[in-house]
């Protein structure tokens, strides 16, 4: 019965171009979109390309089609940092992302995987 009811209405409310950050109806929602085309990696798990033009530690300018973000030691991503009281949803279209947190949980997700993370007080995590 529920399936029949859903099939008679559209769940898509609108289609809009991407903006940064995503416009939302709620002040409690913050949406961002990263579409990086990272170059081949090197033996240290960093990009095998020049970092010239990249502002290490705060690189969001997307020079050459990719950014280091808050990456340290030549590895792009978001090193250990805390959150409290919100959730993040990460969809990996291509490539891989390594997650680790201060509770000892760790994992790798990629190529179509989705990560839904609920942030708790006193817990730090990293996505690299």
What is each stretch, according to the model?
Residues 38, 95, 123:
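Short loop/turn segments at secondary-structure transitions that flank enzyme active sites
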Residues 2-91:
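N-terminal, Lys/Arg-enriched amphipathic/low-complexity engagement segments
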Residues 114:
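Walker A (P-loop) ATP-phosphate-binding motif of ABC ATPase nucleotide-binding domains
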Residues 19-21, 105, 128:
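A generic local secondary-structure boundary/capping motif
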Residues 81-83, 99, 125:
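Histidine-centered active-site/metal-ligand motif
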Residues 120-128:
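Ligand-binding loop in jelly-roll beta-barrel domains
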Residues 75, 91-111, 120:
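A short beta-strand-loop-beta hairpin characteristic of the jelly-roll/cupin
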């Amino acid at each position: 019965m529920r399936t029949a009811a859903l099939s008679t209405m559209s769940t898509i409310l609108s289609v809009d171009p991407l903006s940064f950050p995503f416009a939302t109806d709620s002040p409690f929602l913050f949406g961002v979109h990263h579409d990086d085309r990272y170059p081949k990696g090197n033996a240290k798990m960093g990009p095998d390309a020049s970092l010239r033009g990249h502002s290490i530690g705060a690189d969001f300018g997307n020079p050459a089609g990719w950014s280091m973000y808050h990456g340290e030691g030549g590895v792009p991503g978001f090193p250990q940092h805390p959150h409290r009281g919100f959730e993040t949803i990460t969809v990996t279209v291509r490539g891989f992302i390594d997650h680790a947190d201060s509770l000892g949980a760790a994992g790798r997700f990629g190529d179509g995987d989705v990560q839904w993370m609920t942030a708790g007080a006193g817990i730090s995590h990293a996505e690299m």
